[in-house]
């Protein structure tokens, strides 16, 4: 998976975005305890809808790769 979104792909956009973030986590570009980019930043960077960005981040949380810290944001989980 590349670092860009292919809007013509049969793979849903939120899954592509989650894959990009997952790769950044696994490759150490987003190390443990680092805050994930905000939804606004994801929308701007990848030209996706806000709901798409939220769904991608939720996937990472469900996979145990990210966690929400109330009042602070979403961070890469150290156990990733």
Name each model feature, range by range.
Residues 1-50, 55-67, 72, 78-80:
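Extreme N-terminal segment that seeds HTH/winged-HTH DNA-binding domains in transcriptional regulators
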């Amino acid at each position: 998976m590349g670092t860009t979104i292919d809007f013509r792909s049969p793979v849903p956009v939120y899954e592509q975005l989650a894959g990009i973030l997952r790769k950044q986590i696994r490759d150490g570009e987003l190390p443990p305890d680092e805050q994930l980019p905000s939804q606004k930043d994801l929308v701007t960077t990848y030209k996706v809808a806000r709901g798409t960005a939220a769904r991608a981040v939720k996937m990472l949380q469900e996979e145990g790769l990210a966690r929400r810290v109330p009042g602070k944001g979403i961070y890469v989980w150290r156990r990733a």
